[in-house]
Amino acid sequence: MKAVQVRKAYDLVTAEVKKPVLSKDDEVLVKVKRVGICGSDMHIYHGTNPLATLPRVIGHEVTGQVEAVGANVQSLKPGDHVVIEPISYCGSCYACRKGRPNVCAKLSVFGVHEDGGMREYIVLPERQLHAVSKDLPWEEAVMAEPYTIGAQAVWRGQVEKGDTVLIQGAGPIGICVLKMAKLAGAAVMMTDLNNERLAFAKENGADAVVNVQAEHVAERVLEWTGNEGANVVIDAVCLPETFALSIEAVSPAGHVVVLGFDERAAQISQLPITKKEVTITGSRLQTNQFPKVVELLNGGRLMHNGLVTHTFSVDDVHHAFQFIKEHPDQVRKAVITFD
């Protein structure tokens, strides 16, 4: 069968590998239908993902159809449509005991630490698979995992109905955060450098948008919130300067949610954090967000609405990665098909 593998930086190959088989009673064999290309996949391709090990079959935004199940599998049967939860964990470390396996001491992420889903068939434990409606188009189902990232950020920021939320960055993850924040009942302002992205954010529910090259973000936030500041700031740009801006723009008693892995230091003093008693929290992957997202997808309350802009056959995967590399402003989300 075909599998898309990054062997080293910029060395992407479509390899012929053996089709996996069930070896444990709790395992499920899935025929892959769609795989989204995430920013982290591009970082693996570029050799700049600090967490990935190579060579690696990439892909963690995966949907497909169950082909076979192990003897002890109860929740799934052949023919079911599923989405993939890409994390495995030990279940016994401090993070797992606290109900946060997404930061398990022995965390393994599908497509990052272990071979992922950009191949024709995969085998995973039942607990990493969630059934979705067979009426749900594959291009909608493949967005489940990115939506869980948005749901996690909104949960970590404790976003509630009536809150004002500033989301920095109107890229794919920023839009996923936007969708989940609006479903939570928040008013949302979004920032970006790109007017087309900001227009798309407005189409998807943003109440206000700011081009950071044309306007002063913190001043606009104060105007928008009646001088209060944003109750929650979610940084999906993930640069030292946007982290610092988050602290400036957040309201007293507010939350700042950080999604990035930038190792550079930000210039932030203690004073605004303590004076405003700001809660700063990281948000990584997701914890128990799949059931909520699946329910929203099945009910038609979550739709990509233009977020998926490009689809490529697995036979054209090299062209897909080259196109994203050369035309990043044209691509919101690209999806690889395995039909």
From Swiss-Prot:
Miscellaneous field: Member of the exu locus which is required for galacturonate utilization.
Record-stated family: Belongs to the zinc-containing alcohol dehydrogenase family.
Induction: Induced by galacturonate, repressed by glucose.
Keyword field contains Oxidoreductase: yes
Cofactor note: Binds 2 Zn(2+) ions per subunit.
GO terms, molecular function: oxidoreductase activity; zinc ion binding
The name this protein goes by in its record: Uncharacterized zinc-type alcohol dehydrogenase-like protein YjmD
E.C. code: 1.-.-.-
Organism encoding this protein: Bacillus subtilis (strain 168)
InterPro entries: ADH-like_C, ADH-like_N, ADH_Zn_CS, GroES-like_sf, NAD(P)-bd_dom_sf, PKS_ER, Zn_alcohol_dh
Record's keyword terms, sorted: Metal-binding, Oxidoreductase, Zinc
